[in-house]
Amino acid sequence: SQNNDTEFNKGDEVEEIGRFNKADTYDGITTYTSGHFAHYHFVDGTAYPASTFGEVDSTTGEWKAKLSPSVTYGSKGFFLKFENASALGADSSGNSNNWSVNGNLKQSISTPNNLFATFNVNHKQVNTNQAVISSAGTQLDGVNDSYTAQIVCATLGMMKGKWYWETKYSTVGGYLNVGFVKNGGLDATENIRLNKELGDGADANSWAFKAGNSSGQIVKKLRHNNGYTNSDMGVTPANGSIIQTWLDLDNGKAWWGFNGTVMNSGSGVGVPNTGAYPHFTFTVADEFYLPAVSIFGFNGAPQCQINFGEGRFGATAVASGVSDNAGHGTFEFSPLAGFYSVCTKNIQTYG
């Protein structure tokens, strides 16, 4: 905040970005940032207004960075662009005040000019068995033997268009439901604040594929409004399996795939790019739809990672690197023609 004293330029202090060491003055706990950095400026000796570094986009109305601001950085100033994956601490101010990189830092294609969706920390259920979101919003860890379901939604929603994302099943314990919710139904159905799974209870506002592979509790079913619409999707979830989701908000259809193959709807193998054999059909309401997951812990702590196109499952990069037809996103498997990664540029164009 304005006029707040920082540890920068004190001379006798180790300067850190993304890490706060409270050992000397607080409770001895060191905390770390779990998020994204874009352009990071530190100016020594001059106070500039925000308009020096950013401006309002005339088309979208969004605040965007000025990529080459006119700034005098001073002797100890620096400008981190994070544009070199092998030297994320390189100073672009001209001062050569380079930083040493520590920890498991990853370069991201998600930037203020094109943000990809992540898990939303504001959509977590509040209770004593709180799930933990990490890896810049791409990993969700539940609690072992909590017998408590939690729904977590994405940071971005869509009202129209065709969308694709991938979720990695990364545990042998509990259940993982992968799907989407109608935003207007969140509070009305209490499926965020109460102990609910996607598609659970008297909930006509969420749709999901349910996966489980724990102590005989092997499930692979479609779930909506507290009912199973398909008793067996013909796959067996295992640790490391990738569940694919195709959501068509132009025609009210949804499909799920498993490790690169669209699953059978009961009438035939789904073909999202032609609209054939959807796993669900629904009437699209005039409101936002949010990608979502729910986890339910028993016989092991449930965990999943999600990739909306950023190219990683947690800290692990995808092996393949397939983009959508607009050239955005990086996926393990093909989004198929006409389906797009969940990012702000695609939503501006298609959503």
Predicted regions: what is each one?
Residues 1-47, 62-89, 261-263, 271-279:
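Extracellular glycan-associated modules
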Residues 1-6, 231, 238-266:
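Extracellular glycan-interaction surfaces
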Residues 213-242:
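Short, aromatic/His-centered strand-loop micro-motif at the edge of beta-sheets
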Residues 143-211:
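Secretory/extracellular carbohydrate-interaction modules
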Residues 128-158, 225-231:
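Secreted extracellular polysaccharide-interacting domains
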Residues 1, 58-63, 95-101, 175-199, ...:
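Short edge-strand/loop segments of extracellular domains
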Residues 30-58, 79-85, 248-250, 258, ...:
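Extracellular, beta-strand-rich glycan-interacting domains
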Residues 55-136, 326-351:
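Extracytoplasmic low-complexity segments
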